[in-house]
Amino acid sequence: FLYWMKKTANRYLPLSSDETIGVVIMPHGATKPYNDAVERTIEPLRSKYKIEMAYGMGDAVTIQNAISNLENQGIKKIVFVRMYPTSDQLKEKTDYILGLSDKIPEQWDGLIPPQIRNSAVINTFGGYEEDNLIAGIFLERIKELSKKPEEETIILLAHGGSNDKAENLRKKRM
């Protein structure tokens, strides 16, 4: 009940000029070189936002810890970033865990974890592949690596979707 009261109050409080927005970033997580690259990428954002990382594919304990760490710093408004290619990737799962939805996701595998307990107002987004800026980022990275463009071929690889429906949607978007 106390969490609900705080969350309701936070929803109506305007963001003051000295108040910081918290950000939880949920990348896939992998090997140390991958994780280090992610950390370097988001480092410039740390001067403007309080940031917590929640590596993994929607682990409720990791998400709870990240949200709690921000709340313990006085953060009342949080942006939850699903750092995945498409906007719908893990959205149902994380929305359920974050308490933004009561619908148990269709693609759920294993035991259903509890929804997190928090008083912050949370908004979510994801889907970097759907943003036109990604093409410019790819081009910039290719130019950094390229030595002899006239002799080189660029191949982009991805492991694909978790099911045929997701893969067909991905191909349609391309």
Predicted regions and their residues:
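Active-site-proximal alpha-helix that buttresses catalytic centers in soluble enzyme cores
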Residues: 1-174
